[in-house]
Amino acid sequence: MLIERTCAILGKMLEYCASLVALHSCVIMTTNTHITDDRILILDFGSQYSQLIARRVREAGVYSEMYAFDMSEEDIRAFNPNGIILSGGPESVHEEGSPRAPQVVFELGVPVLGICYGFQTMSEQLGGKVEPGTVHEFGYAEVDIQQRDQLVGNLQDRENQLHVWMSHGDKVSRLPEGFSTTASTPSCPFAAASDEARRFYGVQFHPEVTHTAKGAELLANFVHKICGCGGLWTPEHIIDLRVEQLRAQIGDEKVLLGLSGGVDSSVVAALLHKAIGDQLTCVFVDNGLLRLNEGDQVMQMFADNMGIRVIRADAEERFLTALAGEVDPEKKRKIIGREFIEVFAEEARKLDGVKFLAQGTIYPDVIESAASKQGKAHVIKSHHNVGGLPDDLEFELVEPLRDLFKDEVRKLGTTLGLPHSMIYRHPFPGPGLGVRILGEVKKEYADILRLADDIFMQELRASGWYDKTAQAFAVFQPVKSVGVVGDGRRYAWVIALRAVETVDFMTARFAHLPYELVDKISTRIMNEIKDVSRVVYDVSSKPPATIEWE
Protein backbone atom coordinates (compact mmCIF):
# COMPACT_ATOMS: atom_id res chain seq x y z
CA MET A 1 0.00 0.00 0.00
CA LEU A 2 2.79 2.36 0.97
CA ILE A 3 4.66 1.50 -2.20
CA GLU A 4 1.55 2.19 -4.30
CA ARG A 5 0.98 5.56 -2.61
CA THR A 6 4.63 6.48 -3.05
CA CYS A 7 4.47 5.56 -6.73
CA ALA A 8 1.31 7.61 -7.13
CA ILE A 9 2.94 10.65 -5.50
CA LEU A 10 6.04 10.25 -7.64
CA GLY A 11 3.84 9.97 -10.71
CA LYS A 12 2.07 13.22 -9.84
CA MET A 13 5.42 14.92 -9.25
CA LEU A 14 6.69 13.76 -12.63
CA GLU A 15 3.51 15.02 -14.30
CA TYR A 16 3.98 18.39 -12.55
CA CYS A 17 7.62 18.61 -13.65
CA ALA A 18 6.63 17.70 -17.19
CA SER A 19 3.98 20.40 -17.17
CA LEU A 20 6.57 22.95 -16.02
CA VAL A 21 8.90 21.92 -18.83
CA ALA A 22 6.05 22.16 -21.32
CA LEU A 23 5.04 25.55 -19.94
CA HIS A 24 8.64 26.77 -20.15
CA SER A 25 8.89 25.57 -23.74
CA CYS A 26 5.59 27.22 -24.51
CA VAL A 27 6.75 30.53 -23.04
CA ILE A 28 9.97 30.39 -25.07
CA MET A 29 8.10 29.51 -28.23
CA THR A 30 5.49 32.21 -27.59
CA THR A 31 8.22 34.77 -27.03
CA ASN A 32 10.08 33.71 -30.16
CA THR A 33 6.97 33.52 -32.29
CA HIS A 34 5.31 36.72 -31.18
CA ILE A 35 8.05 39.29 -30.61
CA THR A 36 7.11 40.82 -33.97
CA ASP A 37 3.34 40.43 -33.62
CA ASP A 38 3.11 43.85 -31.97
CA ARG A 39 4.29 45.96 -34.86
CA ILE A 40 4.33 49.53 -36.08
CA LEU A 41 4.28 50.46 -39.76
CA ILE A 42 6.22 53.58 -40.77
CA LEU A 43 5.40 55.12 -44.14
CA ASP A 44 8.36 57.11 -45.43
CA PHE A 45 7.73 60.40 -47.24
CA GLY A 46 11.44 61.05 -47.77
CA SER A 47 12.54 62.65 -44.51
CA GLN A 48 16.21 62.45 -43.58
CA TYR A 49 14.97 61.44 -40.11
CA SER A 50 12.72 58.52 -41.17
CA GLN A 51 15.13 55.81 -40.05
CA LEU A 52 15.34 57.52 -36.66
CA ILE A 53 11.60 56.97 -36.19
CA ALA A 54 11.99 53.22 -36.68
CA ARG A 55 14.97 53.15 -34.32
CA ARG A 56 13.13 55.07 -31.59
CA VAL A 57 10.14 52.73 -31.83
CA ARG A 58 12.41 49.71 -31.50
CA GLU A 59 14.22 51.33 -28.57
CA ALA A 60 10.80 51.34 -26.92
CA GLY A 61 10.76 47.55 -27.32
CA VAL A 62 8.35 47.41 -30.25
CA TYR A 63 9.07 45.94 -33.68
CA SER A 64 8.74 48.36 -36.61
CA GLU A 65 9.32 48.34 -40.34
CA MET A 66 9.62 51.22 -42.79
CA TYR A 67 8.21 51.30 -46.32
CA ALA A 68 7.70 53.92 -49.00
CA PHE A 69 4.57 56.06 -48.64
CA ASP A 70 3.01 54.44 -51.72
CA MET A 71 2.76 50.99 -50.14
CA SER A 72 -0.23 49.13 -51.57
CA GLU A 73 -3.44 48.63 -49.62
CA GLU A 74 -2.98 44.87 -49.92
CA ASP A 75 0.50 45.03 -48.40
CA ILE A 76 -0.60 47.37 -45.60
CA ARG A 77 -3.42 45.04 -44.62
CA ALA A 78 -1.10 42.03 -44.83
CA PHE A 79 1.41 43.77 -42.55
CA ASN A 80 -1.39 44.05 -39.96
CA PRO A 81 0.07 46.93 -37.92
CA ASN A 82 -0.97 47.92 -34.41
CA GLY A 83 -0.39 51.51 -35.46
CA ILE A 84 0.94 53.60 -38.34
CA ILE A 85 3.39 56.52 -38.35
CA LEU A 86 3.55 58.94 -41.28
CA SER A 87 7.05 60.42 -41.52
CA GLY A 88 8.12 63.91 -42.46
CA GLY A 89 9.32 64.77 -45.94
CA PRO A 90 10.77 67.53 -48.13
CA GLU A 91 7.64 68.05 -50.25
CA SER A 92 4.81 70.57 -49.94
CA VAL A 93 1.22 69.35 -50.02
CA HIS A 94 0.53 72.23 -52.42
CA GLU A 95 2.84 70.85 -55.09
CA GLU A 96 1.28 68.88 -57.92
CA GLY A 97 1.95 65.18 -57.49
CA SER A 98 3.15 65.54 -53.93
CA PRO A 99 2.88 62.30 -51.96
CA ARG A 100 -0.24 61.30 -50.06
CA ALA A 101 -0.92 58.58 -47.54
CA PRO A 102 -2.91 55.60 -48.86
CA GLN A 103 -6.55 56.11 -47.90
CA VAL A 104 -6.63 52.71 -46.20
CA VAL A 105 -4.39 54.16 -43.47
CA PHE A 106 -7.38 56.10 -42.14
CA GLU A 107 -9.84 53.22 -42.63
CA LEU A 108 -8.05 50.40 -40.79
CA GLY A 109 -9.21 51.50 -37.36
CA VAL A 110 -5.66 51.60 -35.95
CA PRO A 111 -3.95 54.64 -34.38
CA VAL A 112 -2.12 56.99 -36.76
CA LEU A 113 0.62 59.48 -35.90
CA GLY A 114 1.60 62.09 -38.48
CA ILE A 115 4.97 63.81 -38.07
CA CYS A 116 5.66 67.15 -39.82
CA TYR A 117 4.72 66.50 -43.48
CA GLY A 118 2.88 63.38 -42.31
CA PHE A 119 0.71 65.59 -40.07
CA GLN A 120 0.10 68.01 -42.94
CA THR A 121 -0.99 65.43 -45.49
CA MET A 122 -3.15 63.67 -42.88
CA SER A 123 -4.84 66.97 -42.05
CA GLU A 124 -5.54 67.82 -45.68
CA GLN A 125 -6.70 64.31 -46.59
CA LEU A 126 -9.16 64.37 -43.67
CA GLY A 127 -10.65 67.75 -44.59
CA GLY A 128 -8.33 70.24 -42.91
CA LYS A 129 -6.27 72.97 -44.54
CA VAL A 130 -2.54 73.50 -44.97
CA GLU A 131 -0.96 76.78 -46.07
CA PRO A 132 2.54 78.19 -46.47
CA GLY A 133 3.80 79.65 -43.21
CA THR A 134 4.72 83.33 -43.06
CA VAL A 135 7.50 82.36 -40.66
CA HIS A 136 9.49 79.20 -41.34
CA GLU A 137 10.60 77.26 -38.28
CA PHE A 138 13.93 75.44 -38.43
CA GLY A 139 15.75 74.40 -35.28
CA TYR A 140 14.81 74.64 -31.63
CA ALA A 141 11.35 75.85 -30.61
CA GLU A 142 9.35 76.01 -27.40
CA VAL A 143 5.94 74.41 -27.68
CA ASP A 144 3.14 75.37 -25.29
CA ILE A 145 0.92 72.49 -24.17
CA GLN A 146 -2.70 73.59 -24.59
CA GLN A 147 -4.48 70.35 -23.75
CA ARG A 148 -3.15 67.03 -22.54
CA ASP A 149 -4.15 63.95 -24.52
CA GLN A 150 -2.70 60.42 -24.42
CA LEU A 151 0.21 61.48 -26.60
CA VAL A 152 1.52 64.48 -24.63
CA GLY A 153 -0.40 64.00 -21.40
CA ASN A 154 2.57 63.09 -19.21
CA LEU A 155 5.23 65.14 -20.98
CA GLN A 156 6.50 68.28 -19.37
CA ASP A 157 9.86 69.79 -20.13
CA ARG A 158 9.39 73.11 -18.41
CA GLU A 159 6.21 74.14 -16.66
CA ASN A 160 3.94 73.78 -19.67
CA GLN A 161 6.46 73.84 -22.50
CA LEU A 162 8.36 71.29 -24.52
CA HIS A 163 11.70 71.96 -26.19
CA VAL A 164 11.34 70.50 -29.67
CA TRP A 165 13.07 70.44 -33.06
CA MET A 166 11.13 72.07 -35.91
CA SER A 167 11.86 71.83 -39.62
CA HIS A 168 8.96 73.12 -41.70
CA GLY A 169 7.73 75.89 -43.96
CA ASP A 170 4.06 74.91 -44.45
CA LYS A 171 1.72 74.59 -41.50
CA VAL A 172 -1.77 73.30 -40.73
CA SER A 173 -4.09 76.32 -40.68
CA ARG A 174 -7.40 74.50 -40.10
CA LEU A 175 -7.82 71.19 -38.33
CA PRO A 176 -10.03 68.41 -39.71
CA GLU A 177 -13.38 67.85 -38.03
CA GLY A 178 -13.00 66.02 -34.71
CA PHE A 179 -9.45 67.27 -34.04
CA SER A 180 -8.48 69.59 -31.20
CA THR A 181 -5.29 71.51 -30.49
CA THR A 182 -2.89 70.04 -27.94
CA ALA A 183 0.19 72.25 -28.48
CA SER A 184 1.20 75.46 -30.25
CA THR A 185 3.96 77.98 -30.86
CA PRO A 186 3.51 81.71 -31.56
CA SER A 187 3.86 81.10 -35.31
CA CYS A 188 2.32 77.62 -35.47
CA PRO A 189 -1.12 77.43 -33.81
CA PHE A 190 -1.41 73.68 -34.39
CA ALA A 191 2.01 72.35 -33.39
CA ALA A 192 0.22 69.22 -32.16
CA ALA A 193 -3.36 68.03 -32.44
CA SER A 194 -5.43 64.91 -31.99
CA ASP A 195 -8.73 63.21 -32.62
CA GLU A 196 -8.87 60.89 -29.61
CA ALA A 197 -12.07 59.20 -30.78
CA ARG A 198 -10.43 57.95 -33.98
CA ARG A 199 -6.96 57.80 -32.37
CA PHE A 200 -5.43 60.12 -34.95
CA TYR A 201 -2.52 62.27 -33.76
CA GLY A 202 -0.27 64.82 -35.41
CA VAL A 203 2.81 66.83 -34.43
CA GLN A 204 4.51 69.51 -36.50
CA PHE A 205 7.86 68.93 -34.78
CA HIS A 206 10.20 65.92 -34.92
CA PRO A 207 10.00 63.71 -31.79
CA GLU A 208 12.46 61.21 -33.31
CA VAL A 209 15.51 63.51 -33.16
CA THR A 210 17.58 63.80 -30.00
CA HIS A 211 17.17 67.59 -30.02
CA THR A 212 13.50 67.17 -29.03
CA ALA A 213 13.28 66.80 -25.27
CA LYS A 214 10.88 64.00 -24.31
CA GLY A 215 10.64 62.91 -27.94
CA ALA A 216 11.40 59.28 -27.10
CA GLU A 217 8.73 59.39 -24.38
CA LEU A 218 6.19 60.79 -26.85
CA LEU A 219 6.81 57.94 -29.29
CA ALA A 220 6.69 55.45 -26.41
CA ASN A 221 3.29 56.88 -25.43
CA PHE A 222 2.07 56.30 -28.96
CA VAL A 223 3.25 52.70 -29.31
CA HIS A 224 2.47 51.55 -25.76
CA LYS A 225 -0.46 53.59 -24.43
CA ILE A 226 -2.27 54.34 -27.66
CA CYS A 227 -1.40 51.33 -29.85
CA GLY A 228 -1.31 48.86 -26.94
CA CYS A 229 2.01 47.27 -27.91
CA GLY A 230 4.11 45.33 -25.43
CA GLY A 231 7.89 45.49 -25.10
CA LEU A 232 9.11 42.12 -26.35
CA TRP A 233 11.58 43.43 -28.93
CA THR A 234 14.73 42.95 -26.80
CA PRO A 235 18.23 41.65 -27.62
CA GLU A 236 17.65 38.43 -25.68
CA HIS A 237 14.41 37.66 -27.50
CA ILE A 238 15.91 38.60 -30.87
CA ILE A 239 18.83 36.21 -30.34
CA ASP A 240 16.49 33.37 -29.35
CA LEU A 241 14.39 34.00 -32.46
CA ARG A 242 17.38 34.26 -34.79
CA VAL A 243 18.94 31.04 -33.48
CA GLU A 244 15.67 29.21 -34.05
CA GLN A 245 15.32 30.67 -37.57
CA LEU A 246 18.93 29.92 -38.52
CA ARG A 247 18.66 26.31 -37.41
CA ALA A 248 15.45 25.89 -39.39
CA GLN A 249 16.93 27.50 -42.53
CA ILE A 250 20.36 25.84 -42.47
CA GLY A 251 19.64 22.42 -41.03
CA ASP A 252 22.78 20.26 -41.29
CA GLU A 253 24.32 22.24 -44.15
CA LYS A 254 27.59 24.22 -44.06
CA VAL A 255 27.87 28.02 -44.03
CA LEU A 256 30.67 30.30 -45.24
CA LEU A 257 31.16 33.84 -43.89
CA GLY A 258 33.55 36.56 -45.03
CA LEU A 259 34.85 37.84 -41.70
CA SER A 260 36.25 41.36 -41.75
CA GLY A 261 36.54 42.00 -38.03
CA GLY A 262 33.95 44.78 -38.32
CA VAL A 263 30.88 44.95 -36.10
CA ASP A 264 28.36 43.43 -38.51
CA SER A 265 30.35 40.40 -39.66
CA SER A 266 31.57 39.78 -36.10
CA VAL A 267 28.01 39.65 -34.74
CA VAL A 268 26.93 37.39 -37.62
CA ALA A 269 29.83 35.05 -36.78
CA ALA A 270 28.91 34.92 -33.09
CA LEU A 271 25.21 34.40 -33.87
CA LEU A 272 25.85 31.63 -36.40
CA HIS A 273 28.31 29.90 -34.08
CA LYS A 274 25.69 29.89 -31.34
CA ALA A 275 23.11 28.46 -33.75
CA ILE A 276 25.06 25.88 -35.76
CA GLY A 277 28.50 25.53 -34.16
CA ASP A 278 31.09 23.76 -36.33
CA GLN A 279 28.96 24.01 -39.48
CA LEU A 280 30.32 27.57 -39.82
CA THR A 281 33.59 28.41 -41.57
CA CYS A 282 34.89 31.99 -41.77
CA VAL A 283 37.35 33.38 -44.29
CA PHE A 284 39.41 36.34 -43.08
CA VAL A 285 41.25 38.10 -45.90
CA ASP A 286 44.33 39.90 -44.57
CA ASN A 287 45.06 42.39 -47.34
CA GLY A 288 47.89 44.23 -45.60
CA LEU A 289 45.70 47.33 -45.25
CA LEU A 290 44.41 46.66 -41.75
CA ARG A 291 45.10 48.54 -38.53
CA LEU A 292 48.00 47.60 -36.24
CA ASN A 293 47.75 43.94 -35.11
CA GLU A 294 44.14 43.78 -36.34
CA GLY A 295 44.55 40.45 -38.10
CA ASP A 296 46.00 38.80 -35.00
CA GLN A 297 43.21 40.27 -32.85
CA VAL A 298 40.51 38.87 -35.13
CA MET A 299 42.10 35.42 -35.10
CA GLN A 300 42.51 35.47 -31.33
CA MET A 301 38.93 36.53 -30.70
CA PHE A 302 37.16 34.13 -33.06
CA ALA A 303 39.51 31.21 -33.61
CA ASP A 304 41.27 30.98 -30.25
CA ASN A 305 38.68 32.28 -27.77
CA MET A 306 35.39 31.26 -29.44
CA GLY A 307 36.54 28.13 -31.24
CA ILE A 308 35.21 29.25 -34.62
CA ARG A 309 36.95 27.82 -37.67
CA VAL A 310 38.65 30.79 -39.35
CA ILE A 311 40.77 30.53 -42.50
CA ARG A 312 43.24 33.40 -42.67
CA ALA A 313 44.22 34.26 -46.23
CA ASP A 314 47.46 36.25 -46.16
CA ALA A 315 47.18 38.35 -49.30
CA GLU A 316 49.22 41.47 -48.47
CA GLU A 317 51.69 41.09 -51.33
CA ARG A 318 48.92 40.36 -53.81
CA PHE A 319 46.94 43.51 -52.88
CA LEU A 320 49.99 45.79 -52.84
CA THR A 321 51.10 44.48 -56.24
CA ALA A 322 47.65 45.13 -57.71
CA LEU A 323 47.62 48.66 -56.27
CA ALA A 324 51.11 49.60 -57.44
CA GLY A 325 51.17 52.87 -59.38
CA GLU A 326 47.45 53.63 -58.91
CA VAL A 327 46.59 57.05 -57.42
CA ASP A 328 42.90 57.48 -58.30
CA PRO A 329 40.75 56.86 -55.17
CA GLU A 330 37.83 55.24 -57.00
CA LYS A 331 40.11 52.95 -58.99
CA LYS A 332 41.91 51.95 -55.79
CA ARG A 333 38.57 51.00 -54.23
CA LYS A 334 37.64 48.89 -57.26
CA ILE A 335 41.01 47.13 -57.27
CA ILE A 336 40.73 46.30 -53.57
CA GLY A 337 37.15 45.08 -54.02
CA ARG A 338 38.08 42.94 -57.03
CA GLU A 339 41.05 41.36 -55.28
CA PHE A 340 39.00 40.65 -52.17
CA ILE A 341 36.35 38.85 -54.21
CA GLU A 342 38.98 36.79 -56.04
CA VAL A 343 40.79 35.77 -52.85
CA PHE A 344 37.51 34.92 -51.13
CA ALA A 345 36.36 32.88 -54.14
CA GLU A 346 39.65 30.96 -54.25
CA GLU A 347 39.29 30.03 -50.59
CA ALA A 348 35.64 29.10 -51.05
CA ARG A 349 36.49 26.68 -53.88
CA LYS A 350 38.81 24.79 -51.55
CA LEU A 351 35.88 23.93 -49.28
CA ASP A 352 33.52 21.06 -50.02
CA GLY A 353 29.79 20.98 -49.44
CA VAL A 354 29.18 24.64 -48.55
CA LYS A 355 25.58 25.57 -49.36
CA PHE A 356 25.08 28.93 -47.65
CA LEU A 357 26.89 32.27 -47.74
CA ALA A 358 26.35 34.51 -44.70
CA GLN A 359 26.49 38.29 -44.97
CA GLY A 360 26.26 41.19 -42.54
CA THR A 361 23.55 43.11 -44.39
CA ILE A 362 21.68 45.37 -41.96
CA TYR A 363 18.31 47.15 -42.18
CA PRO A 364 19.59 50.56 -43.42
CA ASP A 365 21.16 48.70 -46.37
CA VAL A 366 17.78 47.17 -47.19
CA ILE A 367 15.97 50.51 -46.85
CA GLU A 368 18.50 52.36 -49.01
CA SER A 369 18.31 49.69 -51.71
CA ALA A 370 14.52 49.93 -52.01
CA ALA A 371 13.20 52.23 -54.72
CA SER A 372 9.78 53.84 -54.42
CA LYS A 373 7.48 53.79 -57.42
CA GLN A 374 7.38 57.60 -57.33
CA GLY A 375 11.10 58.03 -56.81
CA LYS A 376 11.00 59.29 -53.21
CA ALA A 377 13.20 56.54 -51.78
CA HIS A 378 16.86 56.85 -50.90
CA VAL A 379 19.62 56.50 -53.47
CA ILE A 380 20.64 52.90 -54.07
CA LYS A 381 24.06 51.95 -52.72
CA SER A 382 26.15 48.81 -52.88
CA HIS A 383 26.31 47.18 -49.49
CA HIS A 384 26.99 43.44 -49.68
CA ASN A 385 30.19 42.33 -47.97
CA VAL A 386 31.14 40.02 -50.82
CA GLY A 387 28.94 41.21 -53.66
CA GLY A 388 29.91 40.24 -57.21
CA LEU A 389 31.05 36.68 -56.52
CA PRO A 390 31.70 34.53 -59.62
CA ASP A 391 28.72 32.69 -61.10
CA ASP A 392 30.23 29.26 -60.42
CA LEU A 393 29.97 29.90 -56.67
CA GLU A 394 26.30 29.18 -56.15
CA PHE A 395 25.33 29.94 -52.56
CA GLU A 396 22.06 30.57 -50.83
CA LEU A 397 22.19 33.75 -48.76
CA VAL A 398 21.90 33.90 -44.98
CA GLU A 399 21.39 37.42 -43.64
CA PRO A 400 20.43 37.24 -39.95
CA LEU A 401 20.82 41.00 -39.37
CA ARG A 402 18.91 42.31 -42.38
CA ASP A 403 16.04 43.72 -40.29
CA LEU A 404 18.23 45.27 -37.57
CA PHE A 405 19.72 48.73 -37.18
CA LYS A 406 23.38 49.23 -36.28
CA ASP A 407 22.62 50.07 -32.64
CA GLU A 408 20.55 46.88 -32.38
CA VAL A 409 23.41 44.88 -33.90
CA ARG A 410 25.75 46.30 -31.26
CA LYS A 411 23.34 45.34 -28.47
CA LEU A 412 23.16 41.81 -29.86
CA GLY A 413 26.94 41.64 -29.93
CA THR A 414 27.17 42.71 -26.31
CA THR A 415 24.54 40.16 -25.28
CA LEU A 416 26.43 37.46 -27.22
CA GLY A 417 29.56 38.24 -25.23
CA LEU A 418 31.68 40.10 -27.77
CA PRO A 419 34.02 42.66 -26.15
CA HIS A 420 33.01 46.31 -25.91
CA SER A 421 36.20 47.33 -27.74
CA MET A 422 35.09 45.35 -30.80
CA ILE A 423 31.41 46.24 -30.76
CA TYR A 424 31.77 49.98 -30.20
CA ARG A 425 34.94 50.71 -32.12
CA HIS A 426 34.97 53.37 -34.78
CA PRO A 427 33.94 52.56 -38.37
CA PHE A 428 36.69 51.35 -40.67
CA PRO A 429 36.25 51.58 -44.46
CA GLY A 430 36.08 48.41 -46.54
CA PRO A 431 39.24 49.30 -48.51
CA GLY A 432 40.98 49.89 -45.17
CA LEU A 433 44.16 51.96 -45.16
CA GLY A 434 44.02 51.94 -48.95
CA VAL A 435 41.85 55.08 -48.85
CA ARG A 436 43.68 56.62 -45.90
CA ILE A 437 46.96 56.65 -47.81
CA LEU A 438 46.58 59.47 -50.33
CA GLY A 439 47.81 58.56 -53.78
CA GLU A 440 49.77 55.38 -54.39
CA VAL A 441 49.63 52.67 -51.72
CA LYS A 442 52.98 51.26 -50.59
CA LYS A 443 53.93 48.94 -47.74
CA GLU A 444 56.24 51.61 -46.31
CA TYR A 445 53.35 54.08 -46.16
CA ALA A 446 50.98 51.53 -44.63
CA ASP A 447 53.48 50.64 -41.89
CA ILE A 448 53.99 54.31 -40.97
CA LEU A 449 50.25 55.00 -40.98
CA ARG A 450 49.48 51.97 -38.80
CA LEU A 451 51.85 53.22 -36.09
CA ALA A 452 50.55 56.80 -36.22
CA ASP A 453 46.92 55.67 -36.12
CA ASP A 454 47.61 53.39 -33.17
CA ILE A 455 49.19 56.24 -31.17
CA PHE A 456 46.16 58.41 -31.98
CA MET A 457 43.76 55.72 -30.74
CA GLN A 458 45.82 55.06 -27.58
CA GLU A 459 45.66 58.70 -26.55
CA LEU A 460 41.97 59.09 -27.39
CA ARG A 461 41.13 56.09 -25.20
CA ALA A 462 43.41 57.18 -22.35
CA SER A 463 41.85 60.66 -22.31
CA GLY A 464 38.23 59.45 -22.56
CA TRP A 465 37.75 61.06 -25.97
CA TYR A 466 37.43 57.85 -27.99
CA ASP A 467 33.79 57.35 -27.02
CA LYS A 468 33.07 61.07 -27.42
CA THR A 469 33.97 60.97 -31.10
CA ALA A 470 32.05 59.03 -33.72
CA GLN A 471 35.09 58.35 -35.87
CA ALA A 472 38.79 59.17 -35.67
CA PHE A 473 41.79 58.11 -37.73
CA ALA A 474 45.14 59.16 -39.16
CA VAL A 475 45.79 59.90 -42.84
CA PHE A 476 49.11 59.49 -44.65
CA GLN A 477 50.08 62.49 -46.80
CA PRO A 478 52.43 61.61 -49.67
CA VAL A 479 54.40 64.83 -49.23
CA LYS A 480 57.52 65.53 -47.22
CA SER A 481 58.14 68.42 -44.86
CA VAL A 482 61.30 69.79 -43.26
CA GLY A 483 61.70 69.29 -39.52
CA VAL A 484 64.39 69.84 -36.89
CA VAL A 485 65.55 67.09 -34.53
CA GLY A 486 68.22 68.20 -32.10
CA ASP A 487 70.79 69.99 -34.24
CA GLY A 488 69.88 68.01 -37.30
CA ARG A 489 67.47 68.41 -40.20
CA ARG A 490 64.69 65.91 -40.84
CA TYR A 491 62.89 65.67 -44.17
CA ALA A 492 60.01 63.26 -43.65
CA TRP A 493 56.33 62.53 -44.23
CA VAL A 494 53.22 64.38 -43.01
CA ILE A 495 50.40 62.76 -41.02
CA ALA A 496 46.91 64.30 -40.76
CA LEU A 497 44.59 63.56 -37.84
CA ARG A 498 40.83 63.41 -38.41
CA ALA A 499 38.17 63.19 -35.66
CA VAL A 500 34.47 63.92 -36.11
CA GLU A 501 31.27 64.12 -34.10
CA THR A 502 28.11 62.86 -35.79
CA VAL A 503 24.97 60.83 -35.15
CA ASP A 504 24.10 59.62 -38.64
CA PHE A 505 27.37 60.20 -40.60
CA MET A 506 25.34 62.19 -43.16
CA THR A 507 26.58 65.41 -41.60
CA ALA A 508 29.49 65.81 -39.21
CA ARG A 509 31.60 68.46 -37.52
CA PHE A 510 35.24 68.12 -36.60
CA ALA A 511 35.74 67.12 -32.97
CA HIS A 512 36.93 69.96 -30.77
CA LEU A 513 39.69 67.99 -29.10
CA PRO A 514 41.57 69.80 -26.32
CA TYR A 515 44.74 71.50 -27.57
CA GLU A 516 46.74 69.71 -24.89
CA LEU A 517 45.55 66.34 -26.22
CA VAL A 518 46.33 67.21 -29.85
CA ASP A 519 49.75 68.44 -28.73
CA LYS A 520 50.46 65.16 -26.90
CA ILE A 521 49.37 63.03 -29.87
CA SER A 522 51.43 65.10 -32.30
CA THR A 523 54.52 64.97 -30.09
CA ARG A 524 54.31 61.20 -29.65
CA ILE A 525 53.89 60.56 -33.37
CA MET A 526 56.90 62.69 -34.34
CA ASN A 527 59.06 61.34 -31.51
CA GLU A 528 58.20 57.67 -31.98
CA ILE A 529 58.04 57.51 -35.79
CA LYS A 530 61.26 58.80 -37.32
CA ASP A 531 59.69 58.94 -40.78
CA VAL A 532 57.19 61.65 -39.74
CA SER A 533 58.22 65.30 -39.44
CA ARG A 534 54.86 67.06 -39.20
CA VAL A 535 51.33 66.40 -37.87
CA VAL A 536 48.26 68.45 -38.87
CA TYR A 537 44.66 68.38 -37.58
CA ASP A 538 41.74 68.38 -40.02
CA VAL A 539 39.18 71.06 -39.07
CA SER A 540 36.79 70.44 -42.00
CA SER A 541 33.13 69.63 -41.42
CA LYS A 542 30.79 67.56 -43.61
CA PRO A 543 29.54 69.10 -45.80
CA PRO A 544 31.45 70.32 -47.72
CA ALA A 545 34.22 67.85 -46.88
CA THR A 546 33.61 64.11 -46.59
CA ILE A 547 34.66 62.24 -43.44
CA GLU A 548 37.21 60.06 -45.23
CA TRP A 549 39.82 61.86 -47.32
CA GLU A 550 39.37 59.52 -50.29
From Swiss-Prot:
Recorded metabolic or biological pathway in which this protein acts: Purine metabolism; GMP biosynthesis; GMP from XMP (L-Gln route): step 1/1
Residue sites binding ATP per the record: 260-266
GMPS ATP-PPase domain location: 233-425
UniProt xrefs under Pfam families: GATase, GMP_synt_C, NAD_synthase
Residue ranges annotated for the Glutamine amidotransferase type-1 domain, each copy included: 39-232
Substrates-to-products reaction catalysed: XMP + L-glutamine + ATP + H2O = GMP + L-glutamate + AMP + diphosphate + 2 H(+)
This protein's record includes keyword Thylakoid: no
Molecular-function GO terms, alphabetical: ATP binding; GMP synthase activity
Cellular compartments per GO CC: cytosol
Keyword set includes Nuclease: no
Active-site feature positions: 116 (nucleophile), 206, 208
PROSITE patterns: GATASE_TYPE_1, GMPS_ATP_PPASE
Enzyme Commission code(s) on record: 6.3.5.2
Entry function: Catalyzes the synthesis of GMP from XMP.
PANTHER family (UniProt xref): GMP SYNTHASE [GLUTAMINE-HYDROLYZING] (PTHR11922:SF2), GMP SYNTHASE-RELATED (PTHR11922)
Assembly notes: Homodimer.
Protein's recorded name: GMP synthase [glutamine-hydrolyzing]
Gene: guaA
